[in-house]
Design a protein with these regions (language model features):
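Active-site hotspot residues in diverse enzymes, especially metal/ion-binding acidic/histidine motifs
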Residues: 1-196
Length: 196
């Protein structure tokens, strides 16, 4: 199975192997380049899920993404499912008990502290918003603005949402993970806070 070469490969190495260096990082294109089958047909039996990964009739991993979800949510969900593929399915393909089903609770951490889900979320963040690219984009934005003192956090967040084609919430979580904004930062409460 050609997909086995991706077992346990970190997101940054996948991007490097596929020569993807500039945002946005489209997980549908990444999946295609990796050789992963992705379905996003309307399936009422799966509609309560945002996405899932399972073995198809040929024993090959296949990912399903709910087409009823907003596009940016589909993007994060697919990146998350690719994380499951890389870390939980391919390394244990012979023992894989499918499917892994993901919904709002597992994807968006509503108190969930499942290590598999945390790892898949981390993979998704690294795939969609890699540190090397975030840093380059932010530095370029600061330069064009004449310095970070001329920008608010909202300015930077809004720009990143546009450049990386992910949700505002995904960008905020990622910036908090990277220590670029305080953990207690709230987008809607910002009152002209300049970048630090």
């Amino acid at each position: 199975m050609k997909l086995l070469k991706w077992a346990d490969v970190p997101a940054k190495d996948i991007l490097n192997e596929l020569n993807l260096t500039k945002p946005p990082f489209d997980p549908f294109e990444i999946a295609r380049l990796m050789g992963v089958s992705v379905k996003n047909d309307l399936d009422l039996d799966k509609i309560d899920n945002d996405g899932m990964i399972y073995l198809n009739d040929n024993g090959e991993p296949e990912i399903w993404i709910n087409p009823m979800q907003p596009p940016k949510r589909q993007i994060f969900t697919l990146a998350h499912e690719l994380g499951h593929l890389v870390y939980h399915v391919l390394p244990n393909i012979d023992k894989f008990k499918d499917p892994i089903e993901d919904n709002y609770s597992t994807l968006y951490r509503n108190g969930t502290r499942n290590s598999q889900e945390t790892l898949a979320n981390r993979f998704a963040a690294n795939l969609l918003m890699p540190v090397f690219s975030m840093s380059d984009v932010i530095d370029d934005f600061f330069e064009k603005a004449g310095g970070k003192q001329n920008l608010t956090r909202k300015n930077v967040i809004d720009m990143l949402v546009g450049r990386f084609s992910v949700s505002k919430d995904a960008i905020i979580v990622r910036l908090k993970q990277l220590g670029a904004i305080p953990q207690d930062y709230e987008y809607d409460d910002e009152t002209k806070q300049k970048m630090e």
